[in-house]
């Protein structure tokens, strides 16, 4: 697995700014050429520079997999049109929900999705249809309801909050169909998503992620 440490805009919280699947990586406008080249090299995707809600916090607002991409209702029309045109192989939908931090509230790979417990039935149906997943479930991870913020799952493996119980791990592995381990990023942060951006081809971690954390990440994501 390709893996590289990275900082963006002077912070190691790279997952706040970047969304990726196996086809596309969406990044903020204004990154330097070297950073963009590194991202493409590690993740092996087409790079798209964009905004959501006139913000660069793309990793917080966007959730998705290889089948579909979900955007918050705060997405502006021209932003939606731009992403719809450029994410050509993915279904792109706006989720009309009071919840806008979709990256923090939906954990998904191509098989399944674990979602924020307070999504309603209509929202759950739209999420399932857009992502094209076989199974969807509302729940928590280590008592945290923002399930997307405390885990990253690909089609090869997953890493979640260090306090996740053995029982929860088994349930998550059954749901997503991959091995899942516990860990931290950026020198002890339990908010996995903020410091880890991964697809089936490569992994980016925040620059302060330690050697032992990286070994755990590589093992968890199918190294």
From Swiss-Prot:
Any one GO MF term held by the record is: ribosome binding
Glycosyltransferase: present as a keyword of the record? no
Biological process terms from the Gene Ontology for this record are:
cytosolic ribosome assembly
Q: Which InterPro entries match?
A: eIF6 (IPR002769)
Instruction: Kindly state which keywords UniProt assigns to this record, in alphabetical order.
Output: Initiation factor, Protein biosynthesis
* UniProt xrefs under SMART domains: eIF6 (SM00654)
| UniProt cross-references to SUPFAM superfamilies, sorted A to Z | Pentein
Positions the record marks as coiled coil are none
Q: Outline what the protein does.
A: Binds to the 50S ribosomal subunit and prevents its association with the 30S ribosomal subunit to form the 70S initiation complex.
Query: Which PANTHER family does the UniProt record give?
Result: TRANSLATION INITIATION FACTOR 6 (PTHR10784)
What family is this?
Answer: Belongs to the eIF-6 family.
Name of the featured protein? Translation initiation factor 6
Source organism of this protein record:
Saccharolobus islandicus (strain M.14.25 / Kamchatka #1)
Upper classification of the source organism reads: Archaea, Thermoproteota, Thermoprotei, Sulfolobales, Sulfolobaceae
